[in-house]
Amino acid sequence: VLYRPLEALTLSLAQDGVINKLRNSLPECPFPTRYTSISAFNARYRQGWLTATASLVHTATSEHAEKGTVPDDFHRFAPSLSVSMQPWQDESLYFRLMYKSTFRLPTFNDLYYYRLGNRNLRPEKADEYNVGITWSKSGLSVFDYISVTLDGYYNNVTDKIVAFPTTYAWKMANYGKVHAAGVDATLAATVPLTEKIRLIMSGGYTWQKAIDLTDSDAKNY
């Protein structure tokens, strides 16, 4: 559903339903079924040099199995906000800000895989922050087109789902708290070689530092 109460403001609402099932020939299979409801509300405001987008997504799941226990019903709101600013209308220069709350539900393998699965897993959660700049230009003397982007980001991840070694076998577990920071840079350009031939070039660079904050006594803390 799309609604525009003002020329600069657009509102939308979307609803999805998903059913997932796991079936195999192993006698230990619990034959789980997951019902998921996803509701998304979005708002977009654009006026002059400013564009702002906000969203709120609600996810609710319920699982049933023919054998054994299942995780508790789950629901979570995940907000996000992004802002783009173009200070000069005659220049394709944009400054960007973004915040996003995300999560990852345990998969059927994480929960029910024979001996490895753990039905008490919690969803993996992350808070993501990003600051970026984009610049592009057309019709230069050497380049038909050139584009440069630079982004810095910071992620805070908790309840990370990992395969954790135990005495006799591996086991899925919520283990870990990670802070990750990094920089992404890209460059793309188009150079005319002849009237009908263009050379397209692109490249990227990524630097990232991830810190494990799970155990202050561990060597990799």
Residue ranges and their predicted role:
Residues V1, Y35-F41, A60, F77-L81, ...:
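Hydrophobic, lipid-facing positions within transmembrane beta-strands of outer-membrane proteins
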Residues Y3-T10, G48-L50, P87-L93, S138-I146, ...:
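Short loop/turn motifs that connect adjacent beta-strands in outer-membrane beta-barrel proteins
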Residues R4, A8-D90:
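Signature of Gram-negative outer-membrane beta-barrel scaffolds
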Residues E7, W49, S147-N156, A173-Y221:
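Gram-negative outer-membrane beta-barrel transporters
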Residues L11-L13, L50-A54, P79, L93-L97, ...:
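Transmembrane beta-strands of outer-membrane beta-barrel proteins
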Residues G17-R23, Q47-W49, L56-H64, M85, ...:
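Transmembrane beta-strands of outer-membrane beta-barrel pores
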Residues L26-T33, K67-A78, L105-K125, N155-H179, ...:
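Outer-membrane beta-barrel domain signature, especially the mid-to-C-terminal portions
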Residues W88, F95-M98, R104, E124-A188:
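Membrane-embedded beta-barrel scaffold of Gram-negative outer-membrane proteins
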